[in-house]
């Protein structure tokens, strides 16, 4: 079995800037309506989703949490947060730190999708 993750966005170029330059994912393919992002062996499809033919909005890009979200484990949370913000991300609250050198940051990508950056505690 193989898992690929689709991230629905309203602007592919802004999403590529965020996930590529901001979070450091490789972007081997970038088209007008979609892009392929890779982290190790994990594939992410960045997909532009427009309103349906009736004009009704199929997806709402207001900030929300769902039962499923992405956690990216990083070595230097401060550096990755800085790059993510420079690439169009939004920090939803201050970085939460623990006493063992770890931390977590809750961010939104440019389309409002929630992600977490996790720096594991030092052993």
PLM regions and their residue ranges:
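Vicinal oxygen chelate
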Residues: 1-3, 25-72, 81-108, 119-123
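Conserved beta-strand-loop-alpha-helix junction that forms the acyl-donor binding cleft
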Residues: 9-11
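Short, conserved charged micro-motifs
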Residues: 14-15, 77-81
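Conserved active-site tyrosine of GNAT-family acetyltransferases
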Residues: 15, 19-20, 84, 112
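Short glycine-/small-residue motifs
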Residues: 114-117
